[in-house]
Amino acid sequence: VDPEQAYDWWAADYDSQPDNLMLALDEQVFGSLLQEMSLAGKQVIDVGCGTGRHWNHLLSGHPASITGYDVSEGMLKKLQEKFPGQHTVKLNDHRLEATASASADLLISTLTVAHISNIKETLQEWDRVVKPGGHIIITDYHPNALARGGRRTFKHNTETVAITNNVHPVPDVIAMAGQLGWQLLRLEERNIDDTVKHFYEKQQALSLFEAFKGTPIIYGLLLVKNNAAQ
């Protein structure tokens, strides 16, 4: 199912998933990367913001503003219920039309990149809106797991729905970022190992755990835009 439809369906229950492995690991990875910087007075863009999973964390840093972009009206409605009056924009393609060039101090995109087919054009658009010296944080379902048949799924009306994903190898994403003049500051990866086994036990999916054990399941990148001279 395409991401727009899938996340419209998922929106009602998205914030009620205490046993969701990816969301738990994303909290760890994103939090680790975000602690590298101060948000005070900064302009922040969240691409694929969903229901605003990270917005309590972001707002606690007192940024000047956050703009959330997402393809799903359902997810944006949930975000507005949680954070009334915050600036959100429905995405129709890769263009961040509500954001001026070289205006963002920080652009984040969590658990979203694999949903993007035109990744090169998307990164170019992100480059347009980020200031020279600004930062980019990306986290996502690890492409190694997707390439091995891993799927992003959820329950909808008792049916299991799988969301369309694209495999963008991490070295390719880093290389494309480098071509834009972005410098990689940190790479974080988490593997499926015994520390996450209990998630699979709760889902009665130990066979899946054994099949994917040792496989990277999530990655995170912290980058800085160093292309002022370009």
Predicted regions and their residues:
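Class I SAM-dependent methyltransferase SAM/SAH-binding core
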Residues: I45-V47, T51-L96
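Conserved Class I S-adenosyl-L-methionine
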Residues: L185-Q230
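Short alpha-helix
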Residues: N165-L187
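A short glycine-rich, Lys/Arg-flanked "PGG" loop and its adjoining helix->strand segment in the class I
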Residues: K120-P132
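A short acidic, Gly/Pro-enriched loop at the edge of an enzyme's catalytic core
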Residues: A98-L107
